Amino acid sequence: MISLYTQATHMKFVYDKATEVEFLKSERILKEKFQAKDTSLSRTAPVRRNIASDIRSFYNDELHIMPIGFLKFIEYYYDLEKIDYVIKEMRRYPKPNKEFLRLLMKGDIEMGGEFPRPYQIDAVVEAVRQRIGGIEVFTGLGKTLIMAILCKVYSESRILILENTIDLVQQTYEKLYKCGLGAELGVIQGANDDDEKRITILCLQSYEKAFNLFPEIQVILADEAHETGRTDTAEKVIYSCQNAPVKFSISATMQTIDNPYESMRLVGNMGPVIYQKNADEGIDEEYLTPTKIEIYQYECEPVPIVGTWSDVYDKIEICPPDKKHTWTQLVEAFEQQNNWAAGLMELFQANMVTNDEECDAALQAFSEIFSKAGYEVTQKGDILLGRKIAYRGDEYTHIVDNKTRNQVIVKIINRYLAQKKRILVLFNRIEHGEILQSMCPGSVLIHGEDDLKARKEAEMYLRENEGVVVFASKIWRKGIDIEQIDNYVNGGGGKSATDAIQKLGRVVRKSRTTEKNIAVVADLDDSCVSPIGRKQSEKRIHVYQDELKLPMEYINI
């Protein structure tokens, strides 16, 4: 008999009483069934040279441990192989508020001025029953209210809510406050470090401020869990909460992660999907706006393929020189750069560095030389970093600087503006947004370098005015709740199913203040650009048509 000892984050397999056959069967299952291809490694040099593998295992065969989220699958495979096992439950679960649950199921609970919908109640009840797992509800179906209800259900527990953007932290705080949880809410993000409240909203970028809090956490809610339930930082936080056996992941796109290893990683950390509500169900039940996809076909000159999506940079890294031989080596390294050699040699001869003050002055001088040579210069600690573009990648040539494609986007926008629509255009790179905005007088541009005030102003601009357009970067790709948006234009293309669904979610919400009766998503068929454009377009069309089952129309423009 195999003993499985379960803890909050992992389970351990003990073979003391197992037969040799049971041991061999178990090890085969754990090694073969719980591994996946990590596509982020597939193009790395060691994998391409067959020195390393892009297959990664979740089973630690030295310690005989595995992430707890796979427990249900272990039981399935053990039962299938008729392996004798016993689960030794070591987790100490916090108790739910049964009286609140009773009133919730009767329909007597009101939160934030609204009564939970039947599917939201069903999701919460299933979550309480399972105590670990994913709630996958489509964007616009009220996942934040589900989180608020769970906070009420576990009314005596310390709860950690994971977010990964400033906007989502702000939005979640406002909604939970509206639901009557304001006095119990604390935020750890940026300058905010309130870790004394029962419920803590943590921006993952500020996780180091919360280390002292992790041992006290009993319940984890991972919002937008396709990211907050599986990244290295998220995993570090989850594994640090060793007293939190109750874990729920919440997102519209937990099962569309393109990387098989990362998809499986989310399950291992947070458990499998235990409740699902799709877009077509939300539309049929009139919780979402009926949505139509418009695919715009156009003609343009084919764009040559470079072979790398991102731009390629020449990079320089210089540590602070504190010895004469360091300066000598530095100059020798740049002797081939004729346009720098004179300046470097002059600097070398004039500055024999003997102390920190001279070192700082030398770094400043180098920074000026790099800038004149066309390098973008930054300083990270004591290291000087310089980079300049060696050549542009396919994203720039296919999307950002594709004049024909950008003109098509503007034509689509003008068509919608003539109908007095509120339009959101999403792009991936700031320079693309700047190009598009320059082609649309009177439009608003928002991106990650803008502060919360500017983002809020852009949000209110869309809410309060008809016949307007806002260009937004990936910061508005998810989680932004502006129900008045009529039309969304996918300006950045892309092949990720997760991104396609998240972006589409910006427009499907029902509007309580406007007469929006249909939401329109505009996307471009980039088949004419190159085989890359064709494959990416086919992937997005597959998501719209086959996964989301939304009506589509092809339009020549």
Label for each model-derived stretch:
Residues Q130-C151:
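Walker A/P-loop
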Residues T144-I149, V153-K178, I430:
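Conserved Walker A/P-loop ATP-binding site and its immediately adjacent core
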Residues K178-K209:
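Inter-Walker segment of RecA-like/P-loop motor cores
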Residues G186-I188, D193, E434-I435, V444-K474:
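Conserved helicase ATPase core of P-loop NTP-dependent helicases/translocases
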Residues E227-K292, Y544:
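Post-DEXD/H (motif II) to motif III coupling segment of the RecA-like Helicase ATP-binding lobe
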Residues G386-N428, I435:
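Conserved interdomain hinge at the start of the Helicase C-terminal
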Residues F471, I480-G493, A519-D523:
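A short beta-strand element within the Helicase C-terminal
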Residues S496-N517:
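Conserved SF2 helicase motif VI
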